[in-house]
């Protein structure tokens, strides 16, 4: 025990040099939950998608208070489980101090404890299709698959508790007030789809499942109390339309705007979005950032606020948007196989709070614990 005490003291000194603040709480054990590495008390996680079929998906950790990460590369899943996460990290959510991750290429969903140590795993065979995105509601994890299902898993042990049939290429899923909203895109072999499925978690059956036609090749759904913001790749994969579904009236509407990624904004009527447009002759990308208010059907351009704080975000390859705490949000950029991505953290007033490496290729999702 004396050795451990000395080791922790030394570790606190090291944490200062890496800007971690966890050691400020004498009661906090940076090795809690059986961790093999010292972890900051208030931490964030970055899911790096990696490169397809390269088995290099990873989860990196960072100090969510200071927006700092380690000086040397960190791969939390590898450190804790002594094996690679797998091929193509798809989605990551946190619920009740547990981490749930879907790995598309490796065809499984795993439950990790707060330290990132695997507790349970659900493999997906050809009958269900490969897993895509995740949502949680009332003790269950809901998984979309490329077999055309939303699969219901018990959050404790990932045992299967049911499934409903949706479109063949089910993509993002979001939950609001016990209702699941599911985007269904076009299939890899070109079969078109433009439906958003609506599923009541209290009546999780094929018969009760509904759908509504929205934009072509639907990809993203972002649900609030009042609206669902919907993004698609469009019929030709070039212009990426932004639609809004009014939950009360049950009517979808094309906003006339384009978006590449979208997340919930500062209230239940607003979404924050980015539209990335690339000129394939010059390979120059121009990013436009905006807030869309569904209640007033108005767009507010905030590009200058974002790019004045982080000039790289004017032309970088944007890979994801993620919601943070207290109205903050994360923007990630990718260099694909050329190097690590970068994470940018902004507050609700578009002030840059910090930026740091993702320690992996193509950061797909950021969450805070």
Where are these regions (language model features)?
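Conserved beta-propeller blade signature
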Residues: 43-47, 98-102, 140-143, 179-183, ...
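Post-signal peptide N-terminal segment of secreted/secretory-pathway proteins
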Residues: 54-138
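Short glycine/acidic-enriched loop and turn motifs that connect beta-strands
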Residues: 50-54, 106-108, 148-149, 186-191, ...
């Amino acid at each position: 025990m004396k050795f451990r005490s000395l080791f922790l003291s030394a570790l606190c000194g090291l944490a200062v040099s890496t800007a971690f603040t966890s050691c400020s709480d004498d009661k906090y054990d940076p090795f809690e939950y059986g961790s093999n590495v010292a972890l900051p008390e208030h931490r964030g996680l970055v899911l790096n998608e990696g490169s397809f079929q390269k088995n290099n998906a990873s989860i990196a950790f960072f100090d969510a208070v200071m927006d700092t990460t380690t000086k040397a590369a960190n791969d939390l899943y590898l450190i804790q489980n002594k094996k690679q996460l797998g091929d193509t990290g798809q989605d990551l959510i946190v619920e009740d101090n547990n981490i749930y991750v879907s790995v598309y290429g490796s065809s499984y969903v795993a439950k990790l404890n707060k330290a990132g140590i695997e507790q349970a795993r659900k493999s997906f065979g050809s009958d269900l299709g490969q897993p895509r995105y995740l949502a949680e509601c009332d003790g269950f994890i809901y998984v979309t698959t490329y077999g055309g299902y939303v699969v219901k898993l018990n959050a404790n042990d990932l045992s299967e508790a049911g499934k409903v049939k949706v479109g063949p290429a089910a993509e993002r899923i979001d939950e609001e007030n016990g209702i699941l909203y599911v985007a269904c895109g076009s299939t890899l072999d070109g079969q078109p789809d433009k439906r958003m499925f609506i599923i009541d978690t209290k009546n999780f059956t094929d018969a009760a499942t509904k759908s509504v036609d929205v934009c072509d090749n639907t990809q993203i759904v972002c649900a609030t109390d009042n609206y669902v913001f919907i993004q698609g790749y469009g019929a030709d994969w070039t212009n990426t339309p932004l639609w809004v579904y009014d939950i009360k009236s049950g009517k979808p509407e094309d906003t006339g705007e384009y978006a590449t990624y979208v997340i919930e904004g500062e209230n239940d009527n607003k979404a924050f979005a980015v539209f990335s447009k690339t000129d394939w002759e010059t390979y120059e990308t121009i990013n436009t950032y905006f807030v869309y208010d569904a209640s007033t059907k108005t767009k507010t351009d905030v590009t200058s606020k974002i790019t004045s704080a982080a000039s790289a975000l004017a032309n970088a390859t944007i890979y994801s948007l993620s919601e943070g705490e207290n109205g903050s949000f994360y923007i990630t950029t990718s260099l694909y196989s050329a190097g690590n991505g970068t994470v940018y953290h902004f507050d609700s007033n578009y002030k840059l709070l910090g930026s740091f490496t993702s320690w992996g290729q193509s950061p797909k999702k950021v969450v805070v614990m």
